[in-house]
Every structure is written in C-alpha cells, then in structure tokens.
Regions:
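A structural boundary signal for the start of the first folded domain, especially the loop/turn
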Residues: 1-145
C-alpha cells in the first residue's frame, strides 16, 4: 500500500464529515474519527486514550463511538462508550471492522471509513434511535494526532 503524508485530502475529509452528520440523523449516538500515522501502543489502548482526550465519554447517554486509524502502521480500532458496551455483545464491532479492513486492503480508505460510519450508525440505531430534539454533542470533524 502506498501512503501519503496525510491520509485524506480536504475533499475526502469533507465527505467523511458529511457522512458522520448524515449517520447521526439515524441515532442519538455520536461518531468521531481520529487519524494519525503511528500507534506506539496497543491499538485499543491508544484508541481509548484518544477517546478520553476527545471527551467522548461526556455524552448524555455515554453512546459515543470512535473510529481510530493509525494508517502508516496499518492498524485501526472501533470503540464505544459505556452506554453502548453495557447493552451490546463483546463482538459488536467485529463485522464492521472486518468490512472496513476489506476496503483498506484495496487502498480505499475514505470508502472504508464511510462504510464504518454508516454501519456504526445502523447498529447503534437499534439501541439508541435518533430522537426529536437530539443535539449534536460532539464535533463531527476528523481529529488528527
């Protein structure tokens, strides 16, 4: 795989942010994407660290989801907050991760992330449907490390 200095250009980032906004119309859950070139620790530990730094645990229903990518190390994770984890099976994110990995192996990073966003929203909507008056509690922007 050939990597660029930055994983996504501004147009690709805009499409991802738009996908997050659209996905959050299906669920009261909050979805964020964080990208960085390297992950020096275990990928889930780093994702949890980023989750905390982004204050994702401060949503009213504790239903935030982080899609974390360390693109040069070819590692990624999806983690959810306590409100989600208390309701779903341990393997809740596995199928979404497997599908995203297929896109990534083909070098289709934007498509893989958008697929992950859409699938996350679809799964979350079963437990946390969108509600009238729902507010966007977290930024939809991609964070970078």
């Amino acid at each position: 795989m050939l990597f660029r200095k930055h994983l996504f250009n501004s147009s690709e980032k805009n499409r991802i942010v738009a996908a997050i906004a659209a996905a959050e119309m299906q669920t009261s859950g909050e979805i964020r994407v964080h990208i960085e070139p390297h992950c020096k620790h275990h990928v889930l530990a780093r994702a949890a660290e980023v989750f905390s730094k982004l204050d994702m645990h401060k949503t009213a229903k504790r239903n935030g989801v982080l899609i974390y990518l360390a693109y040069e190390d070819k590692r990624f994770a999806i983690i959810g907050d306590k409100g989600i984890n208390d309701l779903v099976p341990d393997d809740f994110w596995d199928s979404t991760k497997e599908e995203m990995a297929k896109y990534f192996k083909e070098g289709q990073f934007q498509a893989g992330v958008i697929h992950g966003i859409n699938e996350s929203a679809r799964h979350l909507a079963k437990y946390f449907p969108h509600e009238a008056g729902d507010i966007n509690e977290l930024s939809n922007d991609i964070s970078e490390g």
